[in-house]
Design a protein with these regions (language model features):
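Short, surface-exposed beta-strand/loop "edge" segments at domain boundaries and coil↔beta transitions
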Residues: 25, 72-75, 95-102
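Compact, glycine/acidic-enriched structural inserts
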Residues: 90-123
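Charge-dense, low-complexity intrinsically disordered regions
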Residues: 127-139
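Low-complexity, glycine/alanine/valine/leucine- and proline-rich hydrophobic stretches
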Residues: 65, 75-85, 89-94
């Protein structure tokens, strides 16, 4: 939640998108993106979610999508505990693989940008040496 308060909606390194409720662009609206994600997952078994620690066992309909990538990967909160501490699951496009991050969304983004959190299905050139944020990188 601090992530949205600090940056708002937009994109890191023209790859990692951050969503928020009420975003003027429907593609960046957390409610709309979550609705679309849940519809896409409905009736599917996401086997890699079995790797999410037992404390966070969830079904896809419980996830809240707070971010995504240009490759259609999904960053979703696992809504367990206090909202500011919700962990994240990063789901590869096509629901092939998933990576769990026990930190908040802010900690997850920081880990991705400083290299302490590696996602094997993210491009090798992400992040840039000097990551940049843009509210509208394609304007």
């Amino acid at each position: 939640m601090r992530l949205i308060a600090t940056y708002g909606t937009g994109c890191f390194d023209e790859f990692l998108w951050i969503f928020a409720a009420g975003a003027p662009n429907a593609h960046l609206d957390i409610v709309e993106r979550t609705r679309l994600m849940r519809a896409a997952f409905r009736g599917k078994v996401l086997h890699d979610l079995n790797h999410v620690p037992d404390d966070y066992r969830i079904v896809p309909d419980e996830l809240v999508q707070w971010g995504g990538t240009d490759n259609a990967d999904i960053l979703a909160w696992i809504p367990k505990g206090e909202p500011g501490d919700w962990p994240t699951v990063i789901i590869q496009a096509g629901q092939l693989k998933a990576v769990f991050s026990s930190g908040s969304s802010t900690a997850t983004v920081l880990g991705l940008l400083d290299g302490s959190l590696r996602v094997p299905f993210f491009p090798s050139d992400f992040p840039d040496i000097r990551p940049e944020f843009s509210a509208n990188p394609y304007a």
